């Protein structure tokens, strides 16, 4: 039976495996050091879905004090379409709300039809008035 629980630093190996099995993650950004730093800054807002001892889903969630952010919402292919992603999002939204966060955002690749369909299905809207930009610090 699949259960949703708080993500911990000790989950790194299982989380890393789920991310490696999923397109769209970046080994430069998604290293153990970055994962640990993120969870230390946001200790109560990220969750994993587990089936027995196996991590089969992740939602890395946090905030900057005013806006929540979701990263790497991933469910192993054989577990998709069973409500697990929605359950993880619900847990993360409730955790963010407890910390006083009213709104959350995320980035999805434009050609990720499965991901975009999921977010639309659960009520997330696109912002055609925004352009996403980034730049490496060094």
Regions found by a protein language model. Give the residues of each.
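A conserved beta-turn-beta hairpin within the catalytic core of GNAT-like acetyltransferases
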Residues: 62-71, 80, 126-130
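Conserved GNAT acetyl-CoA-binding A-motif
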Residues: 96-108
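A short helix-loop-beta-strand connector motif used in the catalytic cores of GNAT acetyltransferases and
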Residues: 37-48, 69
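Conserved acetyl-CoA-binding loop-helix of GNAT-fold acetyltransferases
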Residues: 75, 81-94, 121
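A short beta-loop-alpha structural element at the N-terminal edge
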Residues: 2-15
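Conserved beta-strand-loop-alpha-helix junction that forms the acyl-donor binding cleft
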Residues: 106-115, 134-137
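Conserved beta-strand in the GNAT
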Residues: 48, 54-62, 69-74
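Conserved active-site alpha-helix within GNAT-family acetyltransferase domains
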Residues: 86-87, 98, 110-129
